UniProtKB/Swiss-Prot annotation:
Encoding gene, per UniProt annotation: pcyA
Record-annotated disulphide pairs: none
Enzyme Commission no: 1.3.7.5
Coiled coil feature spans: none
Sequence similarity: Belongs to the HY2 family.
Sorted UniProt keywords: Oxidoreductase
Pfam families: Fe_bilin_red
Function noted in UniProt: Catalyzes the four-electron reduction of biliverdin IX-alpha (2-electron reduction at both the A and D rings); the reaction proceeds via an isolatable 2-electron intermediate, 181,182-dihydrobiliverdin.
Catalytically driven reaction(s): (2R,3Z)-phycocyanobilin + 4 oxidized [2Fe-2S]-[ferredoxin] = biliverdin IXalpha + 4 reduced [2Fe-2S]-[ferredoxin] + 4 H(+)
GO biological process terms, semicolon-separated: phytochromobilin biosynthetic process
Protein name listed in UniProt: Phycocyanobilin:ferredoxin oxidoreductase
Molecular function via GO: cobalt ion binding; phycocyanobilin:ferredoxin oxidoreductase activity
Keyword Amino-acid biosynthesis part of the UniProt annotation: no
EC top class named in words: oxidoreductase
């Protein structure tokens, strides 16, 4: 599935968002057997207005034998705001963490960059193979680390949440996301299905992750302003953080 022929919103966004979107799809295509994941047609590409500015949202979704949904969302509000949002939702038959990554930028500056492989175990532990691989990564030092939100206890100890203050720090963040993705894809390929009992624990952990993410007031407020409360609720719970059955 070649993507090079499809024009993308990323061409109009901050360079780090374009680079990160390209990186995510490149690693996915390199390691995983992708097939399309079909969103409702009206939610693949959405346009609205926010405080007089045009709001555009572009969604791309895939699935694989190990992941029920791999979602890459790009959003742009006029020249004020650029957003990248990505989550990989594992199938609950596999004991895999949740990869999540967000970039928020505006007026040429990235104000927030977060990436994590978040545990689905309710005791907040990652699978041993992940713990080992992530521990072996170089320690990164960013000049402007940021504080996680109140609901941020879903994230792992390896989570990066920063305001990159230079091109060098942007490159560091991009490199770390690539490493997270490579660890994750290799972990997924090596994973075996779990027992029915373990699957129930994993489902509970994924539900906890999604319900905490749905509490993100900033995302909800932007969507409500542009499209109304009902639309925002539907988008939050069917596109961004739908709960596994």
């Amino acid at each position: 599935m070649s993507l090079t022929s499809i024009p993308s919103l990323r061409e109009q966004q901050h360079p780090l968002i374009r680079q990160l979107a390209d990186c995510i799809e490149e690693v996915w295509h390199q390691h995983l057997d992708l097939s399309p994941y079909h969103l409702p047609a009206e939610l693949g590409y959405v346009e609205g207005r926010l405080e007089g500015e045009k709001l555009t949202i572009e969604n791309r979704c895939y699935q694989t034998p190990q992941f029920r949904k791999m979602h890459l969302e790009l959003a742009k509000v006029g020249n004020m705001l650029d957003i990248l949002h990505c989550v990989m939702f594992p199938r609950p038959e596999y004991d895999l963490p949740m990869f999540g990554c967000d970039l928020v930028g505006g007026r040429g500056q990235i104000s927030a960059a977060i990436a994590d492989l978040s545990p689905v175990h309710l005791d907040r532990t990652l699978p041993a193979s992940y713990n080992s691989a992530l521990t072996n990564l170089d320690t990164l030092n960013f000049s402007q680390p940021r504080e996680l939100p109140e609901w941020g206890n879903i994230f792992s100890d390896f989570c990066i949440f920063v305001r990159p203050s230079s091109p060098e720090e942007e490159a560091m963040f991009l490199g770390r996301v690539r490493e997270f993705l490579q660890v994750h894809c290799q972990g997924a390929i090596a994973a075996s299905p779990v027992s029915a009992e373990q699957k129930q624990h994993i489902l509970a952990g994924q539900h906890n992750y999604c319900s905490k993410q749905q509490q993100n007031d900033k995302t909800r407020r932007v969507l409500e302003k542009a499209f109304g409360t009902d639309w925002a609720e539907n988008y939050m719970t069917t596109v961004l953080f739908d709960l596994p059955e």
